[in-house]
Structures are given as C-alpha cells and as structure tokens.
Amino acid sequence: MNAREAYEKSLWNSLPEKLRKEIEKCVEHGYMETYFFRSNYPDLFKNKFNIVQILKDLGYFAKIKTINFQDEEDTKLEISWNN
C-alpha cells in the first residue's frame, strides 16, 4: 500500500461506521448517491463540515442543505459519486 492509499484508508476509517456502511451498500447496488437527514441521523451532524471535507478529499461530492418539508425544517447531507 502506498502513502496515498494509506492516507485514503485512514480518511475512510475516520468517517462514522453508519455512513461508511451506507455508502458501501449504495455502491454495491449501483446507486450513484445517498443522503442523510439530521432528524434521522443526528450523530452524523455533530462534525458535519469535517465529514463533508473528508468525503471531498476521498473524491465524493458532498454538501449540506437546509430543506423545508411539510412546514418543518431539516438539514440534509447529500453524497454522490462517479463509478
């Protein structure tokens, strides 16, 4: 394993396990994106900007959006990638 691969593995392992498993499952099934809402996964949003930066460093497209759904506000973490 070269230095870049070791760095990427370290970054990947620094992400919450729940997030890693969801991305792996989506890739396995051929999906090109996934998303998480703060209301369902509040622990993912504790360091949300750190998570977005790690995902970007790993080559994913990630962004945080505030959305309104049925008069309630929520925050959404969107993640997409190219295979």
Where are these regions (language model features)?
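An N-terminal amphipathic alpha-helical segment
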Residues: M1-D43
